[in-house]
Amino acid sequence: VNNCDAPNCRIKYGDNIRALVTYLNVVQCIPFKRIAELISDLCGQKISEGTVQNILKENSTKADAAYEEIRKRIECAPVVGADETGAAVGKELHWNWIFQNDLLTYVYQMKSRGQQAIDSKFPNGLPNSTLVTDRHRSYFNMNVKDHQVCLAHLLRNAEYLNELDTKQDWSRRFIHLIAHAIDLRRAGDITKRKIKVLKTKMKNLLGESLTHLDEEFESFKKGILKVKDYLFTFLTDLHVPYENN
């Protein structure tokens, strides 16, 4: 066995190590410190967190053209789903923003959860798109063709109200209306008359007084009233899904 000292020069990591670092961070969402530990344990190669960061920056730059092309295609897509989720960056809370269609997903991270985070990537909004989202206010400030509220989110909210007060039936009737709309779509049994009946029943339900119930019921109802025009878009445009999952 021959041993020698490492050469006194700048170390350059090979393509395999660089690809592995990028995969572990971008696909597996592993933080810098753990990536450095994994590379050391699996490959016997010491690597610093700073080097991990530099590799990711370099590979990110190489992907800029493709990344921008994805953004442009999302920007002109007829239907787009969007969501945002918190992400710990060091000791700070950042937000991962996701805009996607059936073929492409565009992801970016910002400190802000507000309108400026959206405008930084889509300053003109999505004027050709029906946007499928939760009820986060920033989405409804965007310039879009139309909206569809994610019904999966609403069903979870209503199920919580069921558990909060098992004696009332308001939230159960809300769930029944939403579930019936979904069943119509799945069965392909949609008519203008049935849509009109659904909307009338929802209007009547949202018009009921809930002051005798827990304040969370009234809060939920007020939130639904703000987006009531976007509950059943998926029944008139069959390209639009009823959830953004």
For each predicted feature, which ranges?
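Catalytic center-proximal scaffold of phosphoryl-transfer enzymes
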Residues: 1-245
